[in-house]
Amino acid sequence: GKRVVLLRGASADIIMLAPGETFAISVGGCPIGWIFDPQKPNRLIVGHMGLQCLIDRQLIVAGQKSRKYRSVIDRMWESMNLLPMEASRIQAGYAFPIDPLHYVHQWDYPDSGDNNKRVCEYIAANFGNKCIVDWNNPETRKLGRIHLGNLIRSQYASLGISVENIHGVSTPNAVDVDGHPLWYVTRGPHGKDPRNLVLVTLYQ
């Protein structure tokens, strides 16, 4: 019969779907991502891909690992039990990351500015300059505008997934009749309370 399973914390960050199952998550700017093997269509792995899921912040700022995996994407890949030679056929994607122009990690921010700088430098060095908006400009890079979509794309590509098989959907810019955003983000005008309900289904 039908059943609902509620997950919280780290156990909710990834889930393997079978045909006919649906994954639901409420988000406020964090993207969701997925990995799919067309040769094994009876499973789809879905993950929550907020920044803290994509990098080990404690390792970056304090030099101490806080978990086994660098990123939730690495954990998803292992869960799929795929060989490196199989990566070229894999389909992967993400949806609804916060606009990087709103996702600011300023280097001069009181108390956390130095750590913001370390995080941005780590991301640029390990995943490419395109993960930080205007990284090549010494002044604008200090705004620390992290592009989660490009960070996810870079991590997928590092696994050997073909660029043409990586799909991304940006956060909608839709507004209501009064000009207010219809897509909630925690750093937007609606504040931290509203959320968006995202559903992912693997059809039979």
Where are these predicted regions, by residue range?
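Active-site microenvironment for binding and transforming phosphate-containing groups
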Residues: 1-204
